Amino acid sequence: MIGVISTAYFTMKDKHSIKTVKKYWWKNCVIQHVKYHGKTFIIATVGYGKANAAMTITYLLEKYPGLQTILNVDLALSTNDKHDTGDTTISTKFIYRDADLTVFKDIKYGQIVNEPESFQFDGEFAKVVKDFKLGLTEGVTGTADMLIYNSKQFKEMVDKYGHTIDVIDTEAGAIAQVAKKSSINYIALKIIYNNALSPWDNDPIHKFKMYETVNTLKYLLRRLFNLLSSNYIIDLSQCSQDDLDSINELFEIKHDQWIKLFKPNTHKVLSGFGPSLMLVDKQEKTPVALDIIQVIRSKTKEAEGPSKVILGEDEWKNAPKKWLRKLLFLEQVRVNDDELLWNKSAKYDLNNEKLYKIETVETVANEIAAAIAEKCQDKSSYTYNGATVPEKYLLVNCDARISFYITHNQSHEFVEDKNFGTQLVSNEFLKYLNEALKDVDSPYQQIVIYMTIPALDYRKISVFIPSNKGANRGVKFVALNQKLQRDYTVVDITRNDYDPIKVGSFKVTIRLKSE
């Protein structure tokens, strides 16, 4: 059981293995019980300030004796010039910025009598979260029932402490004090809204910064909850950013099930041993190596992105450039100023601009095949604990930028079932993949292609195409369904010779939804 304390109110949508079991008010707090892939999270939305925070954690610990871990996830200000809007810090050290009891002997500024100078948490849980590699930077959090508004206040704080505090907030330190006395795990994850010394009045990109930080909060929580609820021991600390994007997307869509495609009895998911991931059983006797490659990964150009449409040319110059990847990850819903802390993602009008160049199924399949053929040239093996790993697998992740109809040749009926539609997409790719790879020998025990296709009625369609098992032989994907090939025809909607009323069916689109 894990507790989450935040001043931001957010909800989890019930779907698959995610369910809000209970929600109720206590004092001025909203308490939610969320069952997330089998693990229980207690989410508490609190008022601002140290007293509210201390009261809430005390209540949670008394109400739920099994609660041994607390996370404080929230927005904050930074006094560190290295932090930008949307950056996320992890804090394991906390101090008070407004405690001055130095009149007592040996008491330093920020210290409470009979309490340590700071509250530090360096246990196993902090390492677990750091190993998730969520893009966190470490920093000291200073808590007070006041913010810093000018350079004079900042200088006074530095003079009193002798060093700079990285993050300032109004809750984390109070939670840390109670957590320390209660001997539980505790860390704080803070999404930076702004530098504390930057002017707040008439900030031309204030709304953008609020969208950015609130969306980053949602983005962080989804990835964090996915990994914390996993049954595996996970260390992604040595993964590349491309690998991390693929891994986190797979945990989002399939949770632990995607790992079982390669090794059902996996106990540890580890990086830093040569392949993208090493999948290790509990006895560490039969590890499996997993290479991950990306095909057609979208890149954000400096002058592109939906934020430019909203902000305009001048304001865009000062806006962060990492927005598009986050926006595409999130569910698009409209938000107004009153709803920001309800954790809803911003939705933008792109004026029908295309985010991607549309590709045909054949073109995408050939690009995937070319990447597989190149990777299969590497016949080397990996080692784990001094022994050669006998099996290695290949996962190919592709952002399939395709747009088409699939129509029944006789009835022209719509294909509305998601699973059947996915099967039809897979079937169409198979004929091109097998033809392109017929002369390629693979050193991999199995190759699995994972594609995500933006769809009209679904936020994202997942397509998994596994090859036949067996290393050191030709690449052959699961048998093509000839009947489906006879009964259905793919109609490329980039052409102008189709009639959507006549062809009907399963439509895939590359445009963001608009209301």
From Swiss-Prot:
Domain of life according to the entry: Bacteria
Pfam name, any one: PNP_UDP_1
Nucleus found in the keyword field: no
Subcellular location: Cytoplasm, Cytoskeleton
Recorded coiled-coil stretches: none
Spans annotated as Helical 2: 206-228
A GO CC term assigned to this protein in UniProt: cytosol
GO MF term list: adenosylhomocysteine nucleosidase activity; methylthioadenosine nucleosidase activity
Region (Helical 1) residue spans: 21-34
Residue numbers spanned by region Helical 4: 426-440
Residues where Blocked amino end (Met) is found: M1
GO biological process, one term: L-methionine salvage from S-adenosylmethionine
Keywords: Cytoplasm, Cytoskeleton
Gene3D superfamilies with a match to the protein in the record: Nucleoside phosphorylase domain
Annotated region (Helical 3), positions in chain: 357-376
Signal peptide region: none
Task performed by this protein: Acts as a cytoskeletal structure involved in the shape and motility of spiroplasmas.
Official protein name in the record: Fibril protein
Record organism: Spiroplasma citri
